[in-house]
């Protein structure tokens, strides 16, 4: 198998990172970025029973916790079971109790992930217009701007603008989720304000056409996020970490541009966000977007590093992570000249102990997949399949092998067809590929 990079000194990546406002430290500069795992409970009939972490999901995070990742971010925790990104999302409903099966399973996940010293953070989110139309025919958003695309077999209904009362409920939902997670033993949360989800829909001029106090100027468009931050402060202990994920650039007219991202980051620092994770893009196949292809072809890794340099240049207290395209240790070390930490997502699905092996100088970087990395839906499906393999203690399928990629492609196509007609929990979970796969080591 081919790997990215050449041997370099990885020690800068092993340095602790202190979060100024929470007065907490991550043991190193790696961040496992949030992904949609789709391994929680699902039921058609009873929304209140949706989104309870499964044994498989807990085992996945136990494995990542063994890998010496500095900060581990769970994927896309929904705050409303009727507004979800995908079936199988972890969910904290607004009436969730601080006891019972849901609370216990979230607590078990946190304990498993942090058992070896990693920080565990939950990414909390509302999909807004990016909820499947067969799940929510009347989604809410900043405005009634439709999402004209298809993602993982899903289409999306035309949203309506959220009322001020609904906005208040959203703020309460985020704050309740943070309190729930704090009590369950999490070190912090990350607000998901990137990739086209609801908070991003309020930030972006492309989707926010409001004329009230939540629309127009950037000050108004970021108001919802800052009100959520204030509400969380009232519900959690002082040392609870609060971060946020934003797009540093968007591939659409009137989307977030670097100047706005820079202004936004200054406001986030002023309102005591501990870190910002910079990413880019929305629900759209990257192979269809010329601007995205240009950025990715220009930089073979660290796709948004040039933009990040401008965005974070004025920050003094809020820490910054950059996620998107890092594969070589050399590229990661170089990235630390611009940002404070390095976010990785899909590489940890292929190699859950990647961080451990890099920090010990055992490898020069991540395995290079032969799969087309611009094929958004296929790469997402592959990551979901690998995460479920990890949750079942099976070595993830090797995407540097064309035979394995062919198998993943066939499995992904079958998955999309199956979940279109079968509404059971098992049908919505990623396919479980085992075959001749070796058991996953319990030690990094």
Swiss-Prot record:
Q: What does this protein do?
A: NADH-dependent flavin oxidoreductase; part of the gene cluster that mediates the biosynthesis of aflatoxins, a group of polyketide-derived furanocoumarins, and part of the most toxic and carcinogenic compounds among the known mycotoxins. The four major aflatoxins produced by A.parasiticus are aflatoxin B1 (AFB1), aflatoxin B2 (AFB2), aflatoxin G1 (AFG1) and aflatoxin G2 (AFG2). Within the aflatoxin pathway, the NADH-dependent flavin oxidoreductase nadA is specifically required for the last steps in which OMST is converted specifically to aflatoxin G1.
**Phenotype upon loss of function:** Does not show any remarkable difference in production of B-group aflatoxin (AFB1 and AFB2) compared to the wild-type but leads to significant decrease in production of G-group aflatoxins (AFG1 and AFG2). Leads to the accumulation of a yellow AFG1 precursor called NADA.
Matches recorded under InterPro entries: Aldolase_TIM, NADH_flavin_oxidoreductase, OxRdtase_FMN_N
GO biological process terms, alphabetically, are: aflatoxin biosynthetic process
Family, per the entry?
Belongs to the NADH:flavin oxidoreductase/NADH oxidase family.
| EC category | oxidoreductase
What are the protein's UniProt keywords? Cytoplasm, FAD, Flavoprotein, FMN, NAD, Oxidoreductase
The subcellular localization recorded is: Cytoplasm, Cytosol
- Renumbered residue ranges of the record's region Disordered: 127-149
Pfam families, A to Z: Oxidored_FMN
Q: What is this protein called?
A: NADH-dependent flavin oxidoreductase nadA
Summarize induction of expression. Expression is regulated by the aflatoxin cluster-specific transcription factor aflR.
User: Which SUPFAM superfamilies does the record match to this protein?
Assistant: FMN-linked oxidoreductases (SSF51395)
Q: What is its EC number?
A: 1.-.-.-
Give any Gene Ontology cellular component: cytosol
Residues that hold FMN according to the record: 37-40, 123, 345-346
Gene Ontology terms for molecular function: flavin reductase (NADH) activity; FMN binding
| Residues annotated as binding substrate | 192-195
């Amino acid at each position: 198998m081919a790997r990215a990079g050449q041997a370099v000194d990885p020690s800068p990546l092993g340095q602790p990172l202190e979060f100024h406002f929470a007065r907490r430290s991550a043991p190193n500069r790696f961040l496992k970025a949030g992904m949609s795992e789709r391994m929680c409970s699902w039921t058609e009939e009873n929304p209140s029973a949706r989104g309870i972490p499964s044994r498989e999901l807990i085992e996945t995070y136990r494995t990542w916790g063994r890998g010496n990742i500095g900060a581990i971010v769970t994927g896309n925790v929904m705050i409303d079971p009727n507004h979800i990104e995908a079936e199988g999302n972890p969910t904290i409903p607004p009436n969730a109790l601080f006891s019972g099966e849901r609370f216990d399973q979230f607590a078990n996940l946190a304990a498993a992930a942090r058992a070896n010293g990693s920080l565990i953070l939950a990414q909390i989110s509302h999909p807004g217009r990016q909820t499947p139309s067969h799940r929510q025919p009347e989604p809410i958003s900043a405005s009634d701007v439709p999402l004209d695309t298809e993602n993982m077999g899903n289409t999306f209904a035309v949203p309506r603008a959220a009322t001020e009362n609904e906005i208040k409920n959203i703020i309460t939902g985020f704050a309740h989720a943070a309190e729930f997670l704090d009590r369950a033993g999490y070190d912090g949360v990350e607000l998901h304000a990137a990739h086209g989800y609801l908070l991003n829909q309020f930030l972006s001029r492309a989707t926010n056409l409001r004329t009230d106090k939540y629309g127009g100027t950037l000050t108004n468009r970021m108001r919802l996020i800052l009100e959520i931050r204030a509400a969380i402060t009232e519900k959690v202990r002082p040392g609870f970490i609060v971060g946020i994920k934003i797009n540093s650039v968007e591939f659409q007219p009137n989307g977030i541009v670097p100047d706005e991202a820079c202004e936004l980051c200054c406001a986030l620092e002023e309102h005591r966000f501990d870190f910002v994770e910079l990413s880019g893009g929305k629900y759209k196949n990257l192979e269809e977007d010329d601007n995205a292809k240009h950025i990715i072809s220009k930089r073979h890794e660290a796709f948004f590093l040039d933009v990040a340099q401008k965005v974070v240049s004025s920050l003094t207290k809020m820490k910054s992570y950059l996620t998107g395209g890092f594969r070589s240790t050399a590229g990661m070390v170089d990235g630390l000249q611009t940002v404070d930490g390095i976010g990785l997502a899909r590489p940890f699905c292929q190699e859950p102990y990647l961080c451990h092996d890099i920090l010990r100088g055992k490898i020069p970087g991540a395995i290079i997949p032969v799969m087309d990395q611009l094929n958004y839906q296929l790469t997402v499906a592959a990551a979901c399949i690998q995460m479920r393999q990890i949750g079942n203690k099976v070595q993830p399928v090797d995407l540097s092998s064309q035979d394995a990629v062919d198998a993943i492609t066939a499995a992904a196509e079958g998955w999309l067809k199956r979940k279109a007609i079968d509404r059971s929990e098992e049908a919505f979970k990623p396919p479980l590929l085992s075959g001749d796969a070796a058991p996953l080591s319990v030690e990094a």
